[in-house]
Amino acid sequence: MATLTPRQQQIFDLIRNTIRRTGFPPTRAEIAAEFGFSSPNAAEEHLRALARKGVIELTPGASRGIRLKVAHSDSEMPDQFSLPMAGVMQLTLPLVGRVAAGSPILAAEHIDRQYQVDASVFDERPDYLLRVRGLSMRDAGILDGDLLAVRRASEAANGKIVVARLGDDVTVKRLQRRGGHIELIAENPDFTNIIVEPGEEFSLEGIAVGLIRSSGF
């Protein structure tokens, strides 16, 4: 593994710990705020240095597009995008593909397969994996074809990335409540946010607790 400078090690640890705690990497702005950098551009320079050393991979144009490629030998935390590894505790989770209108998300006809994942990847245990369709959450590091790890829940705090059912559609968005209004926020300026109208059929199917990159599936 490449040798990191003390500052690079600190930033790598922040990325790793943020992923472990939230399931998603920090933004450049969050890294800059944590270390007192004058702007997110300074954080970007450190990230590029880490990428050159081969310990992370950057997704262009995505504010959370940071992927760990390796973990330090003194850490027991695996890469959050790793395939299942021998000798570690495995979870068997249903992989949900397309969801038909009006039917439960875990209905048998929606399950593409059962998939094994490393249990230590997630701070919170997920109940299922959902294959992401589209790029509306690109800037959160969630890309088309990725597998989103989801914990079933009917309530979620503001700012959480959720799986929501709106009428006959199921979507992945960031939840925002303002007073009595609900808005589903896209993490891509090319997509409009969804405002839940009063009386509109709406429910939460779960909260995102992690992500598995789609490469290799």
Swiss-Prot record:
GO terms for molecular function: DNA binding; serine-type endopeptidase activity. Residues 28-48 bind DNA. One of its GO terms (biological process) is proteolysis. It holds the Pfam family Peptidase_S24. It catalyses: Hydrolysis of Ala-|-Gly bond in repressor LexA. Signal peptide: none annotated. Homodimer. PANTHER family: LEXA REPRESSOR, LEXA REPRESSOR-RELATED. Belongs to the peptidase S24 family. This is LexA repressor. It comes from Cupriavidus necator (strain ATCC 17699 / DSM 428 / KCTC 22496 / NCIMB 10442 / H16 / Stanier 337).
